[in-house]
């Protein structure tokens, strides 16, 4: 995704404000067996999930296409003393991945799957998942559940004003997000706007845009089934509550059919 290549240095710091991102990995870890598992994380980014999975004793392969994100992940891994043998980081296109090995678990977190906005792209990713799972393996997918009142609105909105400090750049960055929705296409255009001040006090700006789709629970189940994956369980939040109409998340554990 282009935005991650553009602002990788911001990524961890801008997301510290999101409380739910402190709960998704612990919830996943509670469902992994205690004995070491072979785990493939697709779109691992800066290692936010891959590193704690490896620290818990699992053997993790993290894949991402953004070289700068992987650079930060390697720096964090090495600083924490996590062995490259326990956490291997690869630059690959996750929709065309061929590792010639299979895993106990394949995971896609943090709404990443929604960045694949066409049926063809979604099918390609799910085929990759199926091809890399061992018989009886598990697929873990975590996306937000669509908010129908928001989906019905085509107007642009500006949300999430915030500020964060980036130590590597010695810079405080001010951020807000523009969102434009097209319910007829189930698409959402998201633009992140960043502003900071240079050493002369002059404002500098950066903007990056990407599209995501909306997927409803039944749609997701159909997508999984037509790609050889059977849903074992669905949750609606990280407290383990079942998926319902008002649930904020769609968390799925599936396995090869």
PLM feature segments, named:
Residues 211-257:
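C-terminal lobe and adjacent flexible extensions of AdoMet/dcAdoMet transferase-like proteins
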Residues 136-143:
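Conserved beta-strand signature within the Rossmann-like core of class I S-adenosyl-L-methionine
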Residues 98-105:
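A short acidic, Gly/Pro-enriched loop at the edge of an enzyme's catalytic core
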Residues 123-135:
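A short glycine-rich, Lys/Arg-flanked "PGG" loop and its adjoining helix->strand segment in the class I
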Residues 143-221:
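SAM-dependent methyltransferase
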Residues 1-45:
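Conserved class I S-adenosyl-L-methionine
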Residues 50-96:
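Class I SAM-dependent methyltransferase SAM/SAH-binding core
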């Amino acid at each position: 995704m282009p935005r991650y290549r553009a602002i990788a240095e911001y990524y961890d710091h801008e997301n510290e404000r999101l409380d739910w991102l402190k709960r998704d990995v612990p919830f996943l870890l509670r469902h992994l067996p205690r004995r070491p598992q072979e785990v493939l994380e697709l779109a691992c980014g800066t290692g936010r999930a891959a590193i704690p999975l490896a620290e818990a004793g699992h053997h993790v392969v993290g894949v991402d296409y953004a070289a700068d994100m992987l650079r930060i992940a390697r720096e964090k891994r090495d600083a924490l003393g996590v062995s490259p043998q326990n956490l291997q980081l690869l630059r690959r296109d996750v929709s065309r991945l061929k590792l010639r090995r299979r895993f106990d678990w394949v995971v896609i977190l943090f709404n990443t799957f929604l960045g694949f906005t066409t049926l063809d792209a979604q099918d390609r990713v799910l085929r990759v998942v199926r091809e890399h799972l061992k018989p009886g393996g598990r697929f873990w997918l975590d996306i937000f559940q669509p908010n129908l009142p928001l989906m019905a609105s085509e107007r642009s909105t500006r949300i999430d004003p915030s500020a964060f400090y980036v130590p590597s750049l010695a810079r405080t960055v001010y951020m807000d997000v523009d969102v434009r929705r097209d319910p007829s296409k189930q698409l959402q255009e998201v633009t992140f706007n960043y502003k900071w001040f240079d050493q002369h006090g002059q404002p500098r700006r950066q903007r990056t845009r990407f599209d995501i789709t909306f997927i409803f629970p039944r749609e997701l189940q159909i997508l999984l089934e037509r790609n050889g994956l059977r849903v074992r369980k669905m949750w609606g939040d990280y407290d383990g509550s079942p998926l319902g109409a008002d649930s904020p998340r769609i968390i799925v554990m599936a396995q090869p059919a």
